[in-house]
Curated annotation (Swiss-Prot):
It comes from Rhodopseudomonas palustris (strain BisB18). Homodimer. The active site is at E105 (proton acceptor). It holds the Pfam family Rib_5-P_isom_A. The gene is rpiA. NCBIfam families: PRK00702.1 (NF001924), rpiA (TIGR00021). This is Ribose-5-phosphate isomerase A.
C-alpha cells in the first residue's frame, strides 16, 4: 500500500469525528488535502459545516470541493482542526511547517477545542528533530536572526546547520504572511518545549514549527490498519 493511500485512510478515519454544524480548521499539506477532499464529498451529501483554511492553497481546495468557509474574525472558536504533521512523538508534540503554512496552522490549532493530527505511521518518531525544523522569520535583519537562532539552539543543547528555504524560482520561499522560512537540521530535540520558547523569544522569529500541547489525538495509518494515540 502506498504512502498516499495510507494518508487517505488516516483522513477518512478522522472524518468520523466530524459532526453536522461543526466549525472546522482545515490543515495544509498532502494528508490534509485528502481530508478536505473527503469532507467535500460529505458536504455534497448534505453535511453542514464551515471551515477555516490554514493556507491559500487549502482555501482554493476547499472552495473547489464546495466547502463553505469562514474566518477567525467571524467565529470565536473552532470545534475541531484536522491537519497533518511532519513528525509526531508519543506525547503528541509535533514538527509542522514542511509546506510553509506553520503560522496560520498554529493560529488555527490554538483557536480550536480539539486538534486531530492525521498521518501515515512513518511520521511517528521517538524523538523530534530528524525532520528539519521550520522557523518562520522576518526578512529584515536575517543575519542577526540566524545568529540568535544558533544561540537559542545551543542553549537547548541542539546544533545543526540552518538554511534559508528557497522556492521553485530559486529565490527565498515566501509564506502566505509574507515571511521567510529557515530550516534547522537539528537531528534530535531533547526538550522541544524549551526550544520553542527560546526561539519565539527572538525578535526576528515570527513562529516556529514545534507544536507543543496542541494536538489532542493522532490518527495514524499503517499496513495493519489505523492506530489512535490520544494525549495523556
Amino acid at each position: 500500500m502506498s504512502s498516499d493511500e495510507l494518508k487517505r485512510q488516516a483522513a477518512a478515519a478522522a472524518l468520523e469525528h466530524v459532526r453536522d454544524g461543526m466549525k472546522l480548521g482545515l490543515g495544509t499539506g498532502s494528508t490534509a488535502k485528502h481530508f478536505v477532499e473527503l469532507l467535500g464529498e460529505r458536504v455534497r451529501g448534505g453535511l453542514n459545516v464551515v471551515g477555516v483554511p490554514t493556507s491559500e492553497v487549502t482555501r482554493a481546495d476547499a472552495l473547489r470541493c464546495g466547502i463553505a468557509l469562514t474566518t477567525l474574525d467571524e467565529v470565536d472558536r473552532l470545534d475541531l482542526t484536522v491537519d497533518g504533521a511532519d513528525e509526531i512523538n508519543a506525547a503528541l508534540n509535533l514538527i509542522k511547517g514542511g509546506g510553509g503554512a506553520l503560522l496560520r496552522e498554529k493560529i488555527v490549532a490554538a483557536a480550536s477545542d480539539r486538534m486531530i493530527v492525521i498521518a501515515d505511521e512513518s511520521k511517528l518518531v521517538a524523538n523530534l528533530g530528524r525532520f528539519p525544523l521550520p522557523i518562520e522569520v522576518n526578512s529584515f535583519g536575517l543575519a542577526a536572526t540566524l545568529r540568535a537562532i544558533e544561540e537559542a539552539c545551543a542553549e537547548c543543547g541542539v546544533f545543526g546547520p540552518l538554511s534559508l528555504r528557497k522556492g521553485s524560482d530559486g529565490h527565498a520561499f515566501v509564506t502566505d504572511g509574507g515571511h521567510w522560512i529557515v530550516d534547522a537540521q537539528l537531528g534530535r530535540i531533547p526538550d522541544a518545549p524549551s526550544l520553542a520558547d527560546q526561539l519565539n523569544a527572538i525578535p526576528g522569529v515570527v513562529e516556529n514549527g514545534l507544536f507543543i500541547g496542541l494536538a489532542s489525538m493522532a490518527v495514524l495509518a499503517g499496513p495493519n490498519g489505523i492506530r489512535i494515540i490520544e494525549r495523556p
